[in-house]
Amino acid sequence: MATCRNRTARWIGLTILGVLVLMIIKSCKSSRPDGAVVVKPFDADKYLGKWYEIARKDFKHEKNLNNVTANYSKNADGSIKVVNKGFNYKTKEWQEATGKAKFAGAPDEASLKVSFFGPFYSGYNVIAIDPDYQYALVAGESLDYLWLLSRTSTMPEDVKDDYLRCAQAIGYNTSDLVWVEQSSKY
């Protein structure tokens, strides 16, 4: 009987260890789609502040959200505080999520990892930005995540077109982007 318990305990221990190792490996790297090249040099201080989401690949954490903004500020430890906010047009309620971003490598490269759920990080890669840091194209860790961001609630058509071409060249299907309503009525 004791041998059976020992085997079970050992199996559970090895399973937990395996899961922890996978979590550590996943959280230590920032991934991005093949062909996506991050902005370098990147000025994190110029990137801080409020950004409006113009378009995105839809996923469960942003489902049914309009008026989406992201606000970036520096934490005391040098990481970046991320506050995402959006209005759920189905429930008629504001939703907010606070997370933390860290550089995946050198601080002058726009390859970051962001977490809203404890030790679990996802890739956040600025792959295009204008010289004045007014418009940005952000790739996630796979072709399932993409954002077009602007410092204002609109983006000029020529910038949109350039960013869409850039995303398509990497392999993104941009026909299913959600174009976010930015309205003052909420």
Model segments located where?
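A beta-rich soluble binding module of mature secreted/lumenal proteins
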Residues: 2-186
